[in-house]
């Protein structure tokens, strides 16, 4: 069992139940999955660059990314149907908790001028953020990076509100900006 999973089962569940007064233990929010995605439309023109970004995403997540493909052809964007335009990875279980632990303790402190993430969620218990650079991850070899590439990370929880979601993620180690 990972350190974060153990922390969740032993401490975080109890503190969430006390704070929000859940009558049933099944109401306590749980982290369901983490989705990491990259939009690689510019890199789609260069196959070597596209492959390099897929390898980077694979190193960051620990599993093979799924290539997302264009549904329609759009002549204005020089896009063809079925062309690879992005990549995503869905983390669940042990890998999810390991990534969350690494992200909170190693990656987020490496972000330049980091003062915490925004507390805005989607209103349904999910939280998303965008990163401008993949080089903050320790798995990435800086000498092999040809082009900086951003990514989106989404935490999907069973929380019903943004407050419950951000409280869960904050107790797990994600740092948020304090409200003024």
UniProtKB/Swiss-Prot annotation:
Transmembrane region(s) = none
* Gene Ontology CC: one annotated term: ribonucleoprotein complex
* SUPFAM superfamilies named in the record: RL5-like
Q: What is this protein called?
A: Large ribosomal subunit protein uL5
> Per UniProt, which keywords does this protein have?
Ribonucleoprotein, Ribosomal protein, RNA-binding, rRNA-binding, tRNA-binding
Q: What does this protein do?
A: This is one of the proteins that bind and probably mediate the attachment of the 5S RNA into the large ribosomal subunit, where it forms part of the central protuberance. In the 70S ribosome it contacts protein S13 of the 30S subunit (bridge B1b), connecting the 2 subunits; this bridge is implicated in subunit movement. Contacts the P site tRNA; the 5S rRNA and some of its associated proteins might help stabilize positioning of ribosome-bound tRNAs.
A Pfam entry, by short name: Ribosomal_L5
Q: Which PANTHER family match?
A: 60S RIBOSOMAL PROTEIN L11-RELATED
Q: Which gene encodes it?
A: rplE
**UniProt family annotation:** Belongs to the universal ribosomal protein uL5 family.
GO BP terms: translation
Assembly mode: Part of the 50S ribosomal subunit; part of the 5S rRNA/L5/L18/L25 subcomplex. Contacts the 5S rRNA and the P site tRNA. Forms a bridge to the 30S subunit in the 70S ribosome.
Q: Give the GO molecular function terms.
A: rRNA binding; structural constituent of ribosome; tRNA binding
Top-rank taxon of the source lineage equals Bacteria
């Amino acid at each position: 069992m990972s350190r974060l999973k153990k922390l969740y089962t032993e401490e975080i569940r109890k503190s969430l139940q006390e704070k929000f007064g859940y009558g049933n233990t099944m109401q306590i929010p749980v982290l369901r999955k983490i989705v990491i995605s990259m939009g690689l439309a510019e890199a789609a023109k260069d196959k070597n660059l596209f492959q390099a970004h897929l390898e980077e995403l694979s190193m960051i997540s620990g599993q093979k990314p799924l290539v997302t493909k264009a549904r329609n052809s759009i002549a204005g964007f020089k896009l063809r149907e079925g062309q690879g335009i992005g990549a995503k990875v869905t983390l669940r279980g042990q890998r999810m908790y390991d990534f969350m632990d690494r992200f909170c303790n190693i990656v987020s402190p490496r972000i330049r001028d980091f003062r915490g993430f925004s507390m805005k969620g989607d209103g349904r218990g999910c939280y998303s953020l965008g990163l401008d650079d993949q080089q903050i991850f320790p798995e990435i070899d800086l000498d092999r990076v040809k082009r900086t590439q951003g990514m989106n990370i989404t935490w999907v929880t069973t929380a019903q509100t943004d407050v419950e979601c951000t409280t869960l993620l904050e107790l797990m180690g994600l740092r948020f900006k304090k409200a003024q």
